[in-house]
Amino acid sequence: MYSYEPDTQIFSRRAMILGVGQLGLFGLLAARLQYLQVTQADQYGILAENNRVNIGLIAPLRGRILDRYGQEIATNRPNFQVVMIPEQTKDPIETLRVLEKLVPISPSRRKRLLRDIPRSRGFVPFTVAENLEWEQFAAINLNLPHLPGVEPQVGKLRYYPQDDIFSHMVGYVGRPDGRDLRRDDPLLKVPGFRIGKSGVEKQFDDKLRGSAGSRRVEVNNVGRVIRELARNPGIQGADLTMSMDSALQNEAISLLGEQSGSVVMMDVNSGEVLTIASAPTFNPNQFTVGLSQKEWDGLLDDQRKPLINKAIAGQYAPGSTVKMLIAIAGLEEKVITPEEKIVCEGQYELGGDTFHCWEHEGHGPMNMHDAITNSCDVYFYELARRLGIDPIERVAKKFGLGRPSIPGAFGEKKGLIPGRDWKRANLDAAWQTGETLIAGIGQGYMLVTPIQLAVMTARLANGGKAVTPQLLMNPQNASNTNDDLVSVDANGAENNDIQVDPAHLKLMHKAMTSVVNDPDGTAFGSRFNLSGVASAGKTGTVQVRRISKDERESGIIPNEELDWHLRDHALFIGFAPVKNPKYSVAVVVEHGGSGSKVAAPIAQKLLKMALERDRQPLKIKTASGAKFNKTKKNTAGTA
């Protein structure tokens, strides 16, 4: 009989081996499972959480920019906007058409949306419109039941409550462009984020920007946001308190009107800049939301160049406004005395060339005081010839001309005070005596900016203290400041004495006082008398075209009959009060025609306004944000 026992034994052995193997495999799986779920639970929990949770940046609230009294120049306001999530709409294109009837959508944005929406992942939101009026925003909310996939949102937008008054110096913000986005800064890619593009907004962007916030959101496997888990709003940027006075700035812009030019007013002792205006202006709020191509082209095509900050980047021949410096150089070099008289017959001859005085009939005998009061060109031709260019160059630079007043900041131009070395290096030619004569009346190669003229005037007024412009209140005590705004002289020292004989400065004060208050003075028509307080100054009318001999003989064409770009520039510098000077002012009106008729009245009205405001108790805002009452009053008939 056949036995099955050997086969059974073989089967049992195989089953045992298989069972042991299975047991071992399950043991390994159990051990691995224990390792993953127990030993590595925390690590894989974090990985799972990271796959489920996204962290995104939130743009911080930008710091404010304030004037010296705490009035807002730049702040933030609610930005009412409309966002569309394409996948939640029945028809994104049709929804866009409906929205166009409720809110304004620019042609460029509409074109971009029509192009990008079909290409996008449906859950990615698109900003359809922003910077909406409350009524428009309310209309969207009322129609939401009929607008699936549309979401009204309230963010923050940079806002300039005084519109164009500070447009050039404060600047504006805008969306990061291609060059910005190449920088390794994830905040630049956050929707709605703005950066400083010009002026103070750009110079202090890192201080004003603040620190980014963040939000943690739960997402599904395709990246769609399910819910928000946590939010950190970030830290608002630091506030900046500028030295400017909104009321004076507004008045300066108003006085310039439709003209092209600039005004700078500063404290002659502290250097605090109260007004730094450039015209025409532009509205920085337009840049915040984006200009249309037509608006941008209009700014570029305007011959008055509204995008240029003329106060610091406009370069002009100073004309007669520098005649006091020529006089000081003559006294320092002892080539003339204040009493010596030079006869003006209306022209000056040198080597066969004729140099004309603005007074064609001549002024007659002129001493230094009278020559400044009447702005006699012939007197200064002769004085410049005696001096040579070297002392003129030295004294001009000592008073702040030919070098930046705010080194490294805002794109300021340094102007030009020419000399022998400059001409040899730049024109490969020797200096000529005739060029010295032209420099003696502030023309030729010589170029200055309005802020340099204000600095020059301040140094003339304050007794030779090398004061420099300060654009922040108490910058040495402020933690949110930039050293670029604490100006220094060429030797790196702040507000040093520039080594001028006080007696020489006293002579200049008397002559400049006569310019405004003497009936023979070129600015007599714009004088003011505020309870015994008077001002001093100097006019300048700068020729921008060559007048031919034939035209002189037949009669010089009046400015008003010339094309705008051929008319003379109008300049005026001044300070007040005459006793204990406090404010200096410089006014340049491009192609304004006459310093005495156009620029001087603007300066005088501003000086008077500043003196009147000094008599009022005002709240000054310090750099720390605290306020204190400061009553400014006149003493001994001065302010």
Listing of model-derived features with the role each one plays in the protein:
Residues 2-5, 219-229, 269-321, 325-586, ...:
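Beta-lactam-recognizing serine transpeptidase/beta-lactamase-like catalytic domain environment
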Residues 224-262:
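Conserved, well-ordered alpha-helix/loop/beta-strand core segments that scaffold catalytic motifs
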Residues 33-55:
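Aromatic-capped interface at the extracytoplasmic side
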Residues 13-17:
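N-terminal export leaders
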Residues 94-101, 115-237, 517, 544-555, ...:
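Small/polar-residue-rich segments within soluble enzyme cores
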Residues 57-61, 212, 257-261:
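Short, small/polar residue-rich loop motifs at catalytic or cofactor-binding pockets
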Residues 60, 76-81, 275-281:
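Short beta->alpha transition motifs characteristic of CBS
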Residues 1-10, 23-24:
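Secretory targeting signals
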